[in-house]
């Protein structure tokens, strides 16, 4: 029997699960099929720190050039039209954290639909299928316009074949 400390709050804190959102990476079988999620894209980058390509893990590098499916939300503020959309930003969720400054670099993916393919805006989650690309050059902030020292708007792209 555990020794009593007389402090129930202290005792109960020891048995509570850790706070925060649990990371849920794709299983090996899902990855083999190209089914990825935003947790698979995470890497260790401090908030407002400049991007360093050395932080990208070998597991993440293995996704580069592969056909994948990724589920998320179309970021509405990146659209000029609600129909026949050929380029948009796919984000992890529709919460405020992904819509403003401070969103993690790995929580958004630029989707550029391949020629002849488009999609329409919806407020529900979508699944994008296409070729995953790690692109550390195309989405850099201009040096004098980078917010809080950030260097990139995005580093991931999907060349979209289909959006469901």
Protein language model annotation of sequence segments:
Residues 1-164:
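OB-fold and OB-like single-stranded nucleic-acid-recognition modules
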């Amino acid at each position: 029997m555990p020794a009593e400390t007389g402090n129930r709050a202290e005792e109960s804190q020891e048995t509570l699960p850790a706070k925060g959102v649990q990371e849920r990476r794709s299983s090996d079988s899902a990855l083999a099929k190209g089914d990825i999620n935003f947790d698979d894209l995470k890497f260790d980058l401090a908030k407002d720190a400049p991007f360093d390509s050395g932080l990208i893990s070998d597991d993440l590098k293995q996704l580069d050039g592969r056909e994948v499916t990724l589920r998320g939300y179309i970021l509405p503020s990146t659209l000029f039209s609600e129909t026949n959309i050929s380029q948009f930003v796919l984000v992890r969720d529709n919460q405020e954290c992904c819509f403003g400054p401070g969103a993690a670099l790995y929580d958004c993916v630029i989707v550029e639909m391949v020629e002849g393919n488009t999609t329409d805006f919806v407020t529900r989650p979508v699944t994008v299928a296409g070729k995953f690309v790690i692109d550390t050059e195309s989405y850099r902030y201009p040096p004098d316009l980078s917010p809080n020292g950030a260097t990139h708007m995005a580093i991931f792209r999907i060349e979209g074949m289909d959006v469901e």
